[in-house]
Amino acid sequence: MANKEYNVKEFFKTDLPAYAAYDNARKIASYIDGQKISMRKILYTLLKKYPGKEKIKTETLANVCAAFTNYLHGAANLCGVCNTMAQNFVGANNYATLNGNTGGFGTRYDNNCAAPRYTKVALSEIFKKLLNENDEEIVGRQFFEGDYIEPKFFVPIFPILFLNGASGLSTGFSQDIYPRNPSEIIEYIKKKISGVEKPRMQLLPWFRGHLGKVEFNKELDRNESFGVITKNNMTSYTITELPIGIECKKYIEYLDKLCDNGTICDYNDKCDTETDKILFEIKTTRDFTKKHEGRKLFETLHLVKSLPETLCCIDENNRVREFTSIQEILDAYIEIRLKYYNLRKDYLLKTIKKSLEELSSKYLFVKAIVDKTIVVANKKKDDIVKQIEKQPKILKQDGSYEYLLRMQIYNLTAEKLEELKCQIKSKKEEFDSIKKTSVEDMWTNDLHELKKVL
């Protein structure tokens, strides 16, 4: 193959920035829905193709997703993404967006996943509750290579970024964001949309099922995760939790080193690989116990780990945005989400108004037939249309009265008239209820329902 000359200046001016922008969008999660492109494609495929509770083989889903959403990087990569999304052990996802078969997606003791031909996944019930079907029409879908694919982002009622966290390394940027306590995030959102400009909340990282504590270290200016250790006597300790980010297998290797260099005498590994319960019994000397108290004990036994964060996210324009605090990310999310609540409200009112117009026209049409103002028996279609046109309050739909002319004969009765009357009343009440409800109250109501299942 002949060498091709390429203008270096042109490469750095056009090709490299284009690649970097695409790479960033792939590898860094959005602050709006907490998803990377591949994750969003998987969720969209499940929503459209397999919305039920029945699980589908991971391998099958990956292949269907690659074709359905025009994924450019192969089904094998999507299998790995599914594995990450389905992991639900402590330190992985707090609330996995995919519901996988137990044990197939790793544990705290061994986070390796089974082969994708053996594992199965489905949408988690939590994820379904994070989305509102009325938002789908508002967000719209992207158009790629002649096909409609997934939206640029979902608009969940809760920032999924802080439900499970996110990490990624791309061209020139990286992302490391830990999950937060959903109750605290909901409280922050409620305060913010109720008018509190800067809610004073610490919002420390939170890991579901983790027994240790997370504290902010002012000297290091970062959060730290602690394990749990109990002193039994002067020569014995029991460890019942490890810091976030330290795997059981790696910790055993570290304990072996402590034994080899004489720091500790011995240890017993009593961890339960079935339940992920952590339990190590440590044997030490009296001298060790005297010299190791407080933080020094935690540091020596690797029971404290820093949780540094890099607050880079993809924004609504698929560009990297660097934030300075968790609160700043939340504020940006709230601004976007409120925008879409306004759009949802407008969409609902418009949809209900259109439905009301149709029901009212049907009511007037049926009433006219019952009252014999309009006669349809032995009449040509054009004659019926002319009679309808004399009723100014009966509206056309898509430029014609076809929706009325197609009504079944049993709908042209006094009973149907009463039914339509009830439907109109119900729709008017729904319209009035939505109209008088503020978008802030709509969101608060959604969060109230979500909190019941978190």
Name each model-derived stretch:
Residues 1-222, 281:
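Catalytic phosphate-handling regions of large nucleic-acid enzymes and associated NTPases
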Residues 195-454:
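Charged, surface-exposed alpha-helical interface/stalk elements
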